[in-house]
Amino acid sequence: MSEADAGARDESPSRTAEEPAAAMRIKEERRSSSVDVVDVGNGELLVLHSIFYQGKTLRLPGNRAHMYPVVFQMIKGVCSLVKQLVVAFPKGWDQNTPSISEIAALTKSFNRVAKPFASNWSGSYNTDTLKEWGEPNCSAEVAKAITTYAYECAVPRPADLNQHYKSFTSETYGETNPEQLISIIDELNIGPQDVFVDLGSGIGQLVCLTAAYAKCKKSVGIELSQVPSNFAQDLAGYFKKFMSHFGKNHGKFEHIQGDFLNPKFKQLICEEATVIFINNFAFDAALMLRINTELLQDLKHGTRIVTTKELGTNKKEITFRSTSDINAISHTTELKTTESAVSWTSSHVKFWLTTIDHTKLIKYYEDQRRRQEVKSSREGSEISDGRDMGLKKRKSQRESSVHPDKLQKTEQAAASSHQSPKWNEPDTDYTPPAKKPKKEKLLREQQDATPASSHHHGASSSSGKDREKEKEKKKNKIYEEKKVKTPKPPKSSSSRYSSETPTSHHHHHRSNSISHSSDVIRPSQPKATAPPPPLVPAPARATASTPPPAPPAARAQSPKREEPLEPPTDLIHHGGGQLDAKTMNALHTIREAATTSAQAAAIQDAINSVLSQPTEASPSAFGPPLAHLPAPVAIYPTPPPPPAPAPAAPQQASAAPAAPNVMPVCTEIAAEQRHTFMIPPTDPFYNMIVSYYFAMKQFCNQSKTADPEFVGRLRLDIEAEEARRAELKESITLTSTQIDELLATGVNTLKSRLDELGMPSVTDVTELLAGSKQIVTQHKGLTNTVAQMENSVAVEEQKLRLIGGPDAVRYFDEAMSHPNVDIAKLTDLVITTRPPNFVAQILLPDDSPTASIDSKVSPSSSSSRRPRQPKPRANNTAAGAGGGGKRGTSGGRKSDGGGGGGATEDVELEIRQFVQHALKVDNAVKEKERKARGNFMAAAADRIPR
């Protein structure tokens, strides 16, 4: 059993198995009860007896002063539970923290009283008196208190923890308070089935707290720095002692010194760990990237990660680019936060829970596989459709080789009708219709062929008639098939609107196009996108059961082009007069403005309604159709009066009266045919409004019926937008990471510069400005001091030269370079090394007040002149004794008088020389000051950022 497992116990120990051990422990405590501070070699042990069931005697080093307050707090806590233990203590013992000697005395008294309690309570947890402290398992408060005791014993000076790392790095030390960890354990329901791993555990107090409160199967802390690891080992030892003293059970725990990114820890982190705690608040981006790629991506399913900085965001969808992100295999939620959750700040710090869920990525790949299968199946169906189309094309080619005339006519008939579903589709083999011959040419050919056929033999004519009848039958059959055939909905938007309107007028148009008057100019072939509306005679549209018009062969029997044609009956005004050419041209222009079948039907209906109204105006005064269009139904709900029947032509007098010229009403677009657009068809915006209307109508129909193609396109658009959104979010995340890295680099650079400038504790811009001003002021003061000192040095050097000679400064510098300087010897050396013609200068007191004591020479003093006198002064006493007093007196007066005149001249000369030297020195000092100021300004200019 390892050292870390020494404190592990069963939650329900056997009383019979523990009684012998308890008896032995009582004997051991009795042997040591008389001595509370035991000498062990050079140190001492502080002994404290336990009153808890299965508790062991606590022995702490007695030579460490910081442990005595911990023992005092323990005694105080036990006495608050058992009031009888304070009988031997003096009054007011718990008011203030006593000294070390007083704590030792209290410990001795406590051991004396606690011994009988331990004997009486042996074999019982005594939870009635000890409350939660008597339980074998730790509650939240008990685990917190025991961990705090161990922390205070292991770390005598917590401030030392803030000195072993560099500021603003990933090794920055910060502690999570025990209250926050207890809240996390309760919220995540961490228990004996979990393996708790703290990456960057510091001194390991969270590992010990988890082992005490959650009793995990294993709690491991990994720390890189050496100093916190040493404290963690001490903390583990004291934690085991305190747990044994209080008789508590705890799980296995271990503190490891090393880098948690080392591959040797990967099995522990990725395979065994179920709960991982990472205080990544100060981790830089590079370290977080390594953690994500080297550890988090390999975690097993269900692993829970608690962090102080969010690892990822809850993205709803996974894209191909985000499959390698932590968000693709995890869910992130915010945990509850207590007050003062961390030690480095009083602000609110969030804690995040990231749960590994590999099923997210599995579901994503399954969805991708299903989409690929659907796509491949669609492609296979398209290929099969293409094969069918190829077969049809080859079949049509074979038919064209056998019956070229028949195929050509069939294609022309199909091209003339715009109901072909594939006439404008880009993905089909569409052949544009051949140009039809002009109607006049066809009429001439038919008329020329009629008289020629009358001269043939009877048998040949009969056979020719049979062939003509067969051809007519075939053509009628083809015509009926085309008319009955339901067209396929086209794909292009231009043909989308024509599919919702009746198309019978397209078939009638070919047979009646030649019924127009010769004054109307019509194109030889209608436009592919805007077929003109038909001009069908009224009798042909009398009823819905009217048979289709005659085939082209029957139309060959029509009269020649040169014969005058009767005006169409639908262009005959109900007033009895025929419309003039100008009005007919206007009507045809209006009809040609239609681009879709719906517009053509609406225009024809409007024209019919206008022509059916009786009017008293003459045909020549008939205005354009726009002036006679009926008002919208929504505004004028009263229907117009029934139109009067048109007068019959002379050749049709015996026939029944023709029905009104009205287009058949379509139930789907009845409102459109009754002019609900509220604008005339000739308006420039009419086509655009109608096209928008039908496009919106088709869109609504597809939405209501949930068209698979429409739903598929909509889903593809949604997926594309979601992918775009995911890419933008990922780009934002990468950009934010880069910004954070740059900000961290800038902050580190700023901190290093502030450390160099002596401002390591700056936390605000105001403090930075104040420190900058202080540095500038200090620099100015130092500059002034240097200038003054240089001035003083120059003055002193000049004085030294004046007094000691030109080489005095050199001797002085050489002597000052030695550690021990003898001023007397230096003075003698200066004096002896003077040149023979050296004359000591006199310094005036006004110019050099500091040198008046050392080097000022009085004008009346002869000490400075004695070395220059060849003869010594005569002794006045000897002169008096020799009887030459008068001579001596006169000689003395002469000497005094002569000496006084020479001294005055010498003094004046020395004064002039001194003034000259003083001026030179002053000029030199000023020049130095000027240079110093210039250098300072240049240095200041260089420091200013550009």
From Swiss-Prot:
Assigned keywords, A-Z: Chromatin regulator, Chromosome, DNA-binding, Methyltransferase, Nucleus, S-adenosyl-L-methionine, Transferase
Annotated GO MF terms: DNA binding; histone H3K79 methyltransferase activity; histone H3K79 trimethyltransferase activity
Catalytic activity: L-lysyl(79)-[histone H3] + 3 S-adenosyl-L-methionine = N(6),N(6),N(6)-trimethyl-L-lysyl(79)-[histone H3] + 3 S-adenosyl-L-homocysteine + 3 H(+)
Comp. bias intervals (Polar residues): 410-422
Protein name as catalogued: Histone-lysine N-methyltransferase, H3 lysine-79 specific
Gene: dot-1.1
Source species of the chain: Caenorhabditis elegans
Residue ranges, compositional bias (Basic and acidic residues): 1-18, 368-409, 464-484
Enzyme class: transferase
Phylogenetic placement of the source organism: Eukaryota, Metazoa, Ecdysozoa, Nematoda, Chromadorea
Function of the protein: Histone methyltransferase, which in complex with zfp-1, methylates 'Lys-79' of histone H3 to activate transcription. During stress, the zfp-1-dot-1.1 complex also plays a role in the deubiquitination of histone H2B sites, which negatively modulates the RNA polymerase II-induced transcription of highly expressed genes. Involved in controlling tissue-specific gene expression, particularly in the epidermis.
Comment field (misc): In contrast to other lysine histone methyltransferases, it does not contain a SET domain, suggesting the existence of another mechanism for methylation of lysine residues of histones.
UniProt domain DOT1: residue ranges: 54-369
Observed phenotype of the null mutant: RNAi-mediated knockdown results in the ectopic expression of the neuronal identity-inducing transcription factor che-1 in the epidermis.
Pfam families: DOT1 (PF08123)
InterPro entries: DOT1_dom, H3-K79_meTrfase, SAM-dependent_MTases_sf
Annotated residues for binding of S-adenosyl-L-methionine: 173-176, 196-205, 223, 259-260
Regions crossing the membrane: none
PANTHER family for the chain: HISTONE H3 METHYLTRANSFERASE, HISTONE-LYSINE N-METHYLTRANSFERASE, H3 LYSINE-79 SPECIFIC
GO CC terms in record: chromosome; chromosome, telomeric region; histone methyltransferase complex; nucleus
Quaternary structure (record): Interacts with zfp-1 (via C-terminus) to form a heterodimer known as the zfp-1-dot-1.1 complex or DotCom complex.
Region (Disordered) location: 1-28, 368-577, 849-905
